[in-house]
Amino acid sequence: DVYKRQTSGSGAQDRIRITQRLLPAVPLGVQQATLVQLPPGTPDTVDATALPAYTQAVALPAGALPGRGGLKITLQPRLAQGLSGVRDWFENYPYTCLEQQASRAIGLGDAALWSRVVETMPTYLDEDGLANYFPPRSGDAARGSDTLTAYLLAASDQAATTDPAFALPPELRTRMQNGLLRFVEGRLERRFWSPRPDLEVRKLAALEALSRGGQVTARLLGSLSADPNRWPTSAVVDWLSILRRVTDAPLRERHLQEAGQVLRSRLSVQGTRLVFSTESTDEWWWLMAGGDTNAARLLLAVMDDPAWREDLPRLVTGLIGRQQRNGAWRTTTANLWGSLALQDFGRRFESVPVDGTTQA
């Protein structure tokens, strides 16, 4: 409050008052969270005390500020409610390279848009069957991307498990698969700038895409170092998926166990957000890989693995917790893999309608 008055003459005066709102120095935040599936009751149960119950012991965290915070309990029939934020994000997305077009069509579940993308896709392939982000000009050297080709094959295959309309036409798919196969075998070379050596990680992504079509044999795995501790999380997820599909892989059970242990050791749930301990080194953006896509693809990779069954709800809520404030993830690839993962989870575990009442 500032006051000023003229001491001579007319004695004019003025006053300025500024109101400032003081907010707590420590904002509220989720310190710990849990997710449970409530046991169902029987329709004819009259006595509420006889119904199945869930109890959870709680206590104030050490050093909690008096009078701040509390418990928040929410109930919902599905963990992913419509993904409206992702749909809005895709509907307003303005860019149009091949990856972005494909991600948008599949992410929106728009079969007509996907059909138009597929119609033009052959013009994006080089002479070896590998896809470019933009159509190459006549006379250009073959510069198709093994990374983009693997992504298109894997994403369309995953989407087709729910809606066959998103499968690639057989002739186009075979042409792309053959290009990837030659790349994995070393008969086809692609050199691109990268901030670190990435050939083995690129081969793992290609093998994961090829394994979906049953084209990976034990012989093709022989050139890999099979050292997941050295790999980024995206490569470990690829390795786990490959091993689950290639049943005659050498030392398969040992490698499966090792890959699972590496992934579990990197997992951490902070409040309601899933993070990896290697997050700072997992952003392989030039290969379209990062924390968001890793979380989504891990969920897909372990969806039907009994050893991960108890972890699935935590993986789902942790994946959702990685969304930005607009209810979407940061990139086209993350939004596509995230939506595919949550749709697959809902189809497998949330297909039965929920009704009745719950008391808390």
Task: Indicate residue ranges for each PLM-predicted region.
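Extended, solvent-exposed functional surface patches
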Residues: 1-197, 203-208, 218-222, 285-287
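Long, domain-scale non-catalytic interaction/scaffolding regions in large secretory-pathway
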Residues: 1-7, 11-14, 52-53, 59-63, ...
